[in-house]
Amino acid sequence: MPATMPEGTVSFEVAAPIDQVWAFLSDMRRVGGCVPGVQSVEVLDPHRARWNLKVKIGPLSQEFVVLTETLEQVPLQHGRFRGESDNMDMMGTIDLAPLGDATKVTYTMAVQAKGPLARIMDNFMRSKLKSQTEEFAANVKKALEG
């Protein structure tokens, strides 16, 4: 991922076998329910989707339509994706490793704002990405562990 993009990474353990975790994270509709701010996910084809997000920025909220594309999938191990909206670009990876009956998940998301407010938005995203990735991790654990 480009070094200039604000980035957040979180590693966490899920009490579920790796094949179950991979199937969940490969399902854009199901994983969409774990991404903070996602209002809806429209799957366009097996590799592309349209995500509607609502993000709070201080007292304001901003809505985004993000088109995502799966760039790489190594089943049960690694996935790489990108997203684009009118005012931001995103890159992300998910890596899985078996831990007996559990699975270690490492999730990285990088976001770069575009347009006239890019510098301000990048600074905001730098501070927000850590909590966003941690919230995603907690939501995935809850969805898979019950």
Question: What positions do the PLM features span?
Answer:
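Glycine-rich portal/gate segments that line the openings of hydrophobic small-molecule binding cavities
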Residues: 42-86, 139, 143
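Hydrophobic/aromatic beta-strand elements that line small-molecule binding cavities or substrate pockets
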Residues: 38-39, 65-72, 91-98, 109
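Intrinsic-disorder/low-complexity, polar/charged segments enriched in Ser/Thr/Lys/Arg/Asp/Glu/Gln
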Residues: 5-11, 48-50, 65, 78, ...
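Beta-strand/loop substructures that line and gate deep hydrophobic ligand-binding cavities in soluble
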Residues: 82-131
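Hydrophobic ligand-binding cavity/cleft-lining segments
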Residues: 1-50
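Short amphipathic alpha-helical signal-transduction/dimerization elements
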Residues: 125, 129-145
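Short strand-connecting beta-turns/loops that link adjacent beta-strands
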Residues: 17, 46, 75, 99-102
